């Protein structure tokens, strides 16, 4: 970037400061309106206008305070810069860029509309943006309803643009304006923006699903290929013909002994009840020897599998980590895709999924599931099962998981979707 380009961008940023400050204040007012419409029926944020707990009301009040502070700072910035930025220079800089800006004739109308909307929102929480406004005391509560014109003021009453009320509500006019922009045949920019957003969303969905499949398929494929390649190595170094080792742990050995004893008892039982012809001691010994050889081969193969699983899982883990290291862009897109799915669910769906997750992993019947998981993991790696370790794990890990989940609900979900938390508590009770 050369010096002239840098100077042009700096000048453009300076001349755009009033519009940028007003836009940020306008968006903060829109955020306050969204909270009022979604959670308080379009009324000011107050405990009188909703059936939320004190903690939820305090959360919403804190959010409104933050937005009011943004409005206060940005409007001060707008007033300061709007008096010093030359209009001619501002117009020149905007025309020099490729960014769309409203015509000079339309700009005052847009500014007045935004200031009117900001006055309408902030007027509900005190005079202008004074300390009383930040204290968040709604003026139109149920006990003493007031409007902008009812506020006590020692100064002469001056009618502002926001105090004027037309015959038609402004929200209806804004709706008609939006519809007009959407059906306007000249609004190619809006149509192009919609198409661009759709293509971006479609691309993000395709990349996310493809990345998820890669995370699952590639490690599994590496596991199977590694197991095939490792089998000769395991047979050569761990289980030779001269090696007396048949079992990798005592559990497999006990299972083999129980199976052999069961075969011996079955053989004797069939002879005693007449289901099989009587056999001599030599014949019985030969049959038991054949069964013992068969059992030894089966458990030797199971021991093979345990060693192969250890090495194959190591290769699969490295493959999984390698995919994550080289796919930072895909990870970011997957995170956004999952956020859209999770936070796009209704409050009841969120509460249902949370209750389902907690009941499965930390609920009353979860110890039985954890015990089965630990048994299969130990069998997968050829490790002797330890009842003491299983009980210790079941007594600690679900508790830690439950604590983490409750902290997540309190710290994050309560801030992002407090209504989902309220629904979760009602469903859980």
Swiss-Prot record:
Molecular function as annotated in GO: proton transmembrane transporter activity
Primary location class: membrane
Domain of life: Bacteria
Recorded GO CC terms: plasma membrane
Keywords: Cell inner membrane, Cell membrane, Hydrogen ion transport, Ion transport, Membrane, Transmembrane, Transmembrane helix, Transport
Bilayer topology term: Multi-pass membrane protein
Residues passing through the membrane, by range: 211-231, 306-326, 353-373, 389-409
Entries under Pfam families matching the protein: CemA
InterPro entries per UniProt: CemA
Listed Basic and acidic residues bias regions: 150-161
HAMAP family, per database record: CemA_PxcA
Family that this chain belongs to: Belongs to the CemA family.
Function: Required for H(+) efflux immediately after light irradiation to form a rapid H(+) concentration gradient across the thylakoid membranes. Together with PxcL, contributes to transient H(+) uptake following dark to light transition.
UniProt name for this protein: Proton extrusion protein PxcA
Origin species: Picosynechococcus sp. (strain ATCC 27264 / PCC 7002 / PR-6) (Agmenellum quadruplicatum)
